[in-house]
Design a protein with these regions (language model features):
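Conserved H-loop
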Residues: 137-144
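Helix N-cap at the start of a conserved alpha-helix in ABC-type nucleotide-binding domains
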Residues: 121-122
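Conserved post-Walker A segment of ABC ATPase nucleotide-binding domains
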Residues: 1-63, 126, 132-137
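H-loop (His-switch) and adjacent beta-strand-loop-beta switch element
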Residues: 153-169
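Hydrophobic anchor residue at the start of the ABC signature
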Residues: 93, 99, 127, 143
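Catalytic Walker B motif of ABC-type/P-loop ATPase nucleotide-binding domains
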Residues: 110-114
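ABC-fold ATPase nucleotide-binding domain signature/coupling loops
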Residues: 11-18, 68-97, 169-170, 176-179
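A short, proline-enriched helix->beta-strand linker immediately N-terminal to the Walker B motif
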Residues: 104-108, 137
Length: 179
């Protein structure tokens, strides 16, 4: 969707507004569908967003993203090496590392752009539930083609031919069936 007019701003619950510009980018953590893991250790990949992160903070973020299960099985743990674009990891594991990195960044708004597409349905739901529990007063925006996540969302919007529509609870439940 490419806008041809208008402005974009964020409104806080207290009514204050922030204009969207280069400075407001720090308010976002973004996880794309594609693989964003770099060569190095898991800890080095995580510290790309917070150089001062402790091992404990990294492990907590990995747990939120359901990545600690496979990281902890490696004798090197968070010091395990991964190749460029996550070589040595499955796509689902690489996606969970990217999500953990975004969680560690702890920005007020988390954007997950098809970021769980390589995960099975159960893991995807667990990751999203963990994010919701860990970030109760923050915003998480999920773009998806999978209906399974819609029931976890407070608000559901559908984009069709450039038009954005908010679905009410009944429409949202029906859209799960229509996918």
């Amino acid at each position: 969707v490419h806008p041809d007019s208008g402005t974009c701003f964020l409104r806080a619950s207290d009514g204050s507004e922030v204009e969207m510009n280069a400075d407001s980018r720090s308010m976002f953590s973004y996880v794309p569908q594609g693989n964003t893991v770099l060569s190095g250790t898991i800890a080095e990949n995580m510290r790309l967003v917070r150089e001062d992160a402790t091992d404990e903070e990294i492990i907590n973020a990995l747990k939120v993203a359901c990545a600690w299960d496979f990281v902890s099985r490696n004798p090197a743990g968070i010091n395990a090496k991964v190749g460029e674009r996550g070589r040595g990891l499955s796509e689902g594991q690489a996606q969970r590392l990217a999500i953990a990195r975004a969680v560690l960044r702890d920005a007020p708004i988390l954007l997950l752009d098809e970021a769980t597409s390589a995960l099975d349905v159960e893991t995807e739901r667990n990751v999203l539930r963990n994010i919701i529990k860990q970030r109760p007063n923050k915003t998480c925006i999920v773009t998806t083609h999978r209906p399974t996540v819609l029931s976890l969302c407070k608000r559901v919007y559908r984009v069709v031919k450039g038009t954005v529509t908010e679905l009410d609870e009944e429409e949202s439940a029906k859209s799960v069936m229509d996918f």
